[in-house]
Amino acid sequence: RAEDISEAFIASSKALLITGTHFSTDGVYKASLQALDYAARHNVKRVLDIDYRPVLWGLAGKADGETRFVADQNVSQHVQKILPRFDLIVGTEEEFLIAGGSEDLLSALRTVRELTPATLVVKLGPQGCTVIHGAIPARLEDGAIYPGVRVEVLNVLGAGDAFMSGFLSGWINDASDERCSQLANACGGLVVSRHACAPAMPTPAELDYLFNSPVPITRPDQDVTLQRLHRVTVPRKAWKQLFVFAFDHRWQLVELAQKGG
């Protein structure tokens, strides 16, 4: 709820990151707008991960959670209303299609640009990413394409979160587009090379090792040094028992409760 958002907490932050999924339901939509208002009031950088998931907009069945794109003008118009509020917008090619309301990427990007002067980061999968300031080029190739890390893909879960964490780690510290993209692509590449999501996120020590390797590491999961670094450089904390409720899995939990009486 909007009243649950802490202005003081947001004011203490360098950046506020919100995903597009949060705008798909009314309650979280209002809470997100409240958070954005606080961020703007305190000059906190505002970041949107478009994160388009058709199933969470009611455009795909529950069994189609992996579906990444379904064109829908209502969703496009809904997303376009909030685009002007952000300083940085990140998405895949398909996610910019929904944001721009077109199935042609460049046309979609031009529509987004008409709505916001934000920096746009287009994720290009294994190719890497491109960062767009100002006018949209005639071809993406006319701008800088920052290459991805070539690895054996074992699991794509968490790739987008890892990419964003890497990019933001540079961006909030005023790093160059090239450095932000290098960090983002490396984080995404390492996560997809592992059989995990959040626990697979790399540390700075792992990134340094990857960047300084004299040869490309295409199988990070088989690199003994990387495995060791991931074990010993991830901060450890003894947490008390946690009970976590994921809002996008409510119906499954309700069914379990009903079956259990």
Q: Can you say where each PLM-predicted feature lies in the sequence?
A:
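Short gly/ser/thr-rich secondary-structure transition/capping motifs
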Residues: R1-E3, F69-Q73, S102, V224-R228
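Conserved N-terminal subdomain of the carbohydrate kinase-like
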Residues: R1-G20, D208-P216
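Acidic, amphipathic alpha-helical patches
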Residues: I5-S6, V79, V153
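Solvent-exposed alpha-helices and their adjacent loops that cap or buttress functional pockets
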Residues: A8-A11, I82, R113-E114, V234-W239
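Conserved beta-alpha-beta core of the PfkB/ribokinase-like small-molecule kinase fold
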Residues: A15-T111, A118, P126-A135
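Conserved phosphate-binding/catalytic region of the ribokinase-like
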Residues: D37-R41, N74, G101-V224
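Alpha/beta catalytic barrel-like cores
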Residues: P216-G261
